[in-house]
Swiss-Prot record:
InterPro entries listed in its UniProt record: ATPase_NBD (IPR043129), Heat_shock_70_CS (IPR018181), HscA_NBD (IPR042039), HSP70_C_sf (IPR029048), HSP70_peptide-bd_sf (IPR029047), Hsp_70_fam (IPR013126), ISC_FeS_clus_asmbl_HscA (IPR010236)
GO MF terms held by the record: ATP binding; ATP hydrolysis activity; ATP-dependent protein folding chaperone; unfolded protein binding
Record bears the keyword Glycosyltransferase: no
Encoding gene (name): hscA
Protein name, UniProt field: Chaperone protein HscA homolog
Native source organism of the sequence: Cupriavidus pinatubonensis (strain JMP 134 / LMG 1197) (Cupriavidus necator (strain JMP 134))
Role this protein plays: Chaperone involved in the maturation of iron-sulfur cluster-containing proteins. Has a low intrinsic ATPase activity which is markedly stimulated by HscB.
Amino acid sequence: MALLQISEPGMSPAPHQRRLAVGIDLGTTNSLVAAVRNSIPEVLGDERGRALLPSVVRYLPDRTTHIGYRAQDEAVRDPKNTIVSVKRFMGRGLKDVAHNEHSPYDFVDAPGMVQIKTVAGVKSPVEVSAEILATLRQRAEDSLGDDLVGAVITVPAYFDEAQRQATKDAARLAGLEVLRLLNEPTAAAIAYGLDNASEGIYAVYDLGGGTFDISILKLTKGVFEVLSTGGDSALGGDDFDQRLLCWIVEQAGLQPLSAQDMRLLMVRARAAKEALSEGDSTVIDAVLDSGEIVHLTLTDEIFDTITAHLVQKTLAPVRKALRDAGVTPDEVQGVVLVGGATRMPAIRKAVGDFFGQPPLTNLDPDRVVALGAAMQANLLAGNHAPGEDWLLLDVIPLSLGVETMGGLVEKIIPRNSTIPVARAQEFTTFKDGQTAMAIHVLQGERELASDCRSLARFELRGIPPMVAGAARIRVTYQVDADGLLSVTARETHSGVESSVTVKPSYGLADDDIARMLQEGFREAEHDMKSRALAEERVEADRLVEATTRALETDGDLLSADERAAVEALIASVREIATGEDHHAIKAAVETLSRGTDEFAARRMDRSIKSALAGRKVQELG
């Protein structure tokens, strides 16, 4: 939120001065910048009045760059040095982009994130994105006539921490102060909710160039609450283009193709897809380097048939998000469409059929995200007028937890928790004299650490030596408004503390988040059995270790037969704990516990006598 500057009465400086902040939709295919002028959000155009900036950057041998429309026009003749859809590479490792078989780029494996070899040197996705953001920043400053105090930049709801951090790094490289990263569907909700003063439950169906997001929102007076999110980080309009490209290649029998021909046909495929949004057929014409001529007629029926699986692929996350929110399709009052790909008639029909109502198309689906981001930026800059206050509650898509003994996961912040959020939980030591604790930060829905995604590991050292279970370690998870996580561990007696900010070296592979959620539900019963087994084994280990230590220190309190009986119980627990029956392990643990009750009582008597030895009765009063 904006800081308020307090002046003496009657001495308020520049009472009508506004702080200039913008909203930026950093898209896979196109990017936009918008600002609030006279309380109305509007997209800022370039010198020709064009709102969209193609998210394309071409690198030249003299290390200069062409950005936007010019780069897009030059992509066909210089595909290796013209980077398109860079958003798909943000926060990704080499293995995550290896499936892009039609990509013309020379990828370089580098620590943290894949990079791309160009004539101007090796470039990271962060650097490429920074070129786009810098162009939008300059456009905004030219339009508004002053420097910006910051920007709200939108990201897909399913961007993980690595991808979000990469976006913030790109903004800083472009000279932009990031006021907040905002989920794209949430930005659309801001634009639609405030424009129409609507209340109720809404679905935001966002099919952009490279990602698909679905958000279920509850809009009430002054409050935007995200009930659930879902989506596919590797599904977008580009995939429809790719499928159409494959169809063109198949129909024309064109194999193999040069990178330049591939890029030319991709441009033709995209143009044909867009033409079908206005008519029921179009002609695809192209002349290749080899002299071959491509001339094909594409009808909407053919296009719908070859892309039907992609349309259906978007509906699976929709069903999941509705289940998570606890609502049915007929409870949804309206469906907001976001992203240029939602102009496809097949998408609009599928969404309408699923929800039983035509989707809302009041606002331009290409612009709605930027408009919502501009409104949020205006608010964060402190420019809102009385009565314009509203609250935005966003959520995290995957649970965050910590590994405990036995390889179990203790969830600290469950998925779909509203952010920003901070949650803390206390843990203790497992062994006597334990002076350090390893903290393993995890992300996912499974019960075992081995089935979740590892985000970070760090150690808390300097814990005072105590008996097992006496130390108190408070672990705090804090997720900021941008979805970035920091974890702090503090021993409450001594005050020793350690922390980590989670910036993973690279993001989740395509479809990993959706897969993790699906596995969490599919394997729930198996996971609970595995968790029960692990918990009983941990309890068995704890009791066996404690009883063994007790025999070492106070074994003289038992007769030879009594000691042999206890040792037999210990051996039985150890053997049964190697099995898979958690009920049997629990029974064995309870038998050992009952079998050592008398031993525990004798140890307690000895401890009390030792504590009272040599002390007078008066001292005890």
